[in-house]
Amino acid sequence: MIKETIEDAKDRMEKSVESLRSQMSKVRTGRAHPSILDSVMVNYYGTDTPLKQLANITTEDSRTLALTVFDKSASAAVEKAIINSDLGLNPASAGAVIRIPLPPLTEERRRDLVKIVRAEAENGRIAVRNIRRDANGDIKDLLKEKEITEDEERNAEEEIQKLTDKFVKQIDEALKAKEADLMEI
């Protein structure tokens, strides 16, 4: 029973950290990266379709993304979707290729993004700690039902704490890397 509880906590903590990394990757840095456009949905024949299903997105240089739309008739809809997204990007169509120059981030915008990333990291830490609390509660329930001894309970709680520390450290490292990325000019 203890092993299952600890494994469940570990799996949930891993998912929390992965979710945080995914959220952080969506925060725009000064560099062009195709994942910036992951959240863009295009109205394609009346259906909202993810942009990455309609176009090949590549990085042309550190400040420019290039899109090659598979269906040329959808180019206008793709451009409109990018303009209407909250990313603040202005695509420029050049025949079959749509180029998206990324404006450099201002110092003020960088600081705002760092605040956002720090808040996301704190939410990630809170999620990991909540998982720890749930797992420790499950262990205490096993102790109350006399399915485990007090020593087993203490050992399980120590192991859960080690897992918590490990995943909080991963969150802190991801935050540090993202902050450095954001503040880099």
Curated annotation (Swiss-Prot):
Coiled coil regions in record: none
Cellular compartments per GO CC: cytosol
Transmembrane segments: none
Record-level Gene Ontology MF annotations: ribosomal large subunit binding
SUPFAM superfamilies on file: Ribosome recycling factor, RRF
Cellular compartments annotated: Cytoplasm
InterPro entries in the record: Ribosome_recyc_fac, Ribosome_recyc_fac_dom, RRF_sf
GO biological process, one term: cytoplasmic translational termination
Gene3D superfamilies: 3.30.1360.40, Ribosome-recycling factor
Keywords, alphabetical: Cytoplasm, Protein biosynthesis
Signal peptide span: none
Record function comment: Responsible for the release of ribosomes from messenger RNA at the termination of protein biosynthesis. May increase the efficiency of translation by recycling ribosomes from one round of translation to another.
PANTHER family for this protein: MITOCHONDRIAL RIBOSOME RECYCLING FACTOR PSEUDO 1, RIBOSOME RECYCLING FACTOR
Family, as annotated: Belongs to the RRF family.
Name the record gives this protein: Ribosome-recycling factor
Organism: Idiomarina loihiensis (strain ATCC BAA-735 / DSM 15497 / L2-TR)
